[in-house]
Amino acid sequence: MPDLRWKAYGVAALIFALDRFTKWLVETNVSVMDTYHVIPGFFDIVHSENRGVAFGILNDSTSEWRTTILVVLAGAAVIFIAAMLWNAQRLDRASFWGLSLILGGAAGNVFDRAMFGKVTDFLDLYYRDYHWHTFNVADSAIVVGSCLLLIDLLRPKRQAANVS
């Protein structure tokens, strides 16, 4: 398992770097709330700033503690996931990838919130009147990682053969 630990942290670091790079590209090239139509009627790049959590929850909160509380809670989750990876004796492939993706995505969003007090979102999917909430690479990694963990949880485990 020691080799896998470093691979997991490497995957997380790549997700973190990709997330930070894409946010930087948007922050330096797209004004807040400007829109670039990538696939008209389906996908846009829209620079938005989220001071809350997923789906804009707490975005309108005026509490001076909002950012501190969110950084502490999400930071604790990052530490917990990193410790799970470090202490794991064995991980199925789906759990390995799932935890690695979640760790990288969560670290990316925690970094932004701690450094800037907000998270930059820019990926905008929609179809006609249906509009998904704007998100970023870190959010995508967290969702894909969570799905992989769910698949691993629901997938039947192989039973050891009975030798008697």
UniProtKB/Swiss-Prot annotation:
Catalysed reactions, semicolon-separated: Release of signal peptides from bacterial membrane prolipoproteins. Hydrolyzes -Xaa-Yaa-Zaa-|-(S,diacylglyceryl)Cys-, in which Xaa is hydrophobic (preferably Leu), and Yaa (Ala or Ser) and Zaa (Gly or Ala) have small, neutral side chains
Predominant localisation class: membrane
PANTHER family the UniProt entry points to: LIPOPROTEIN SIGNAL PEPTIDASE
EC number: 3.4.23.36
GO cellular component: plasma membrane
The organism of origin for this protein: Solibacter usitatus (strain Ellin6076)
Pfam families linked to this entry: Peptidase_A8
Domain of life (superkingdom): Bacteria
Protein name: Lipoprotein signal peptidase
Chain ranges passing through the membrane: 68-88, 96-116, 134-154
Keyword check for Disulfide bond: no
Family: Belongs to the peptidase A8 family.
Protein function: This protein specifically catalyzes the removal of signal peptides from prolipoproteins.
Enzyme category, top tier: hydrolase
Keywords from the named record: Aspartyl protease, Cell inner membrane, Cell membrane, Hydrolase, Membrane, Protease, Transmembrane, Transmembrane helix
Membrane topology qualifier: Multi-pass membrane protein
Lineage summary: Bacteria, Pseudomonadati, Acidobacteriota, Terriglobia, Bryobacterales
Involved pathway(s): Protein modification; lipoprotein biosynthesis (signal peptide cleavage)
Subcellular location: Cell inner membrane
Residues annotated as the enzyme's active site: D121, D139
GO BP term (any one): proteolysis
MF-aspect GO terms: aspartic-type endopeptidase activity
Encoding gene (name): lspA
HAMAP family in the cross-refs: LspA
